[in-house]
């Protein structure tokens, strides 16, 4: 069974805290089968899990960043709310979406560096 980066991170958290899947099922309020599907990338990671995992495991800032990164890198889709943005920001989002599949690695890295500078 292949796990997503999030799945691996979550399993390590459970092991470090001597918990099994059933324990996570209880505090997340979902079935063990659902958690397993999320860990393997068959189901989307529910947004509320980040806060639940941070609270349950008492994650520090570094661990929170690691968890957020694992969640982000495990996502299959990304949604943007462009309801309250400027027309230029909206054009940027739409153009990025249209061009994304054709971006080469060098251009993607350049865009990433620009965005990191402005974050």
Model-derived features with residue positions:
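DNA major-groove recognition helix of helix-turn-helix
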Residues: 10, 38-39, 49, 57
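Residues within the helices of the helix-turn-helix
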Residues: 11, 22, 51
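The alpha-helix within a helix-turn-helix
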Residues: 14, 25, 54
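Short alpha-helical DNA-recognition segment
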Residues: 18-36, 67
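Recognition helix of helix-turn-helix/homeodomain-like DNA-binding domains
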Residues: 28-45, 52
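Short, charged recognition helix plus adjacent turn
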Residues: 65-101
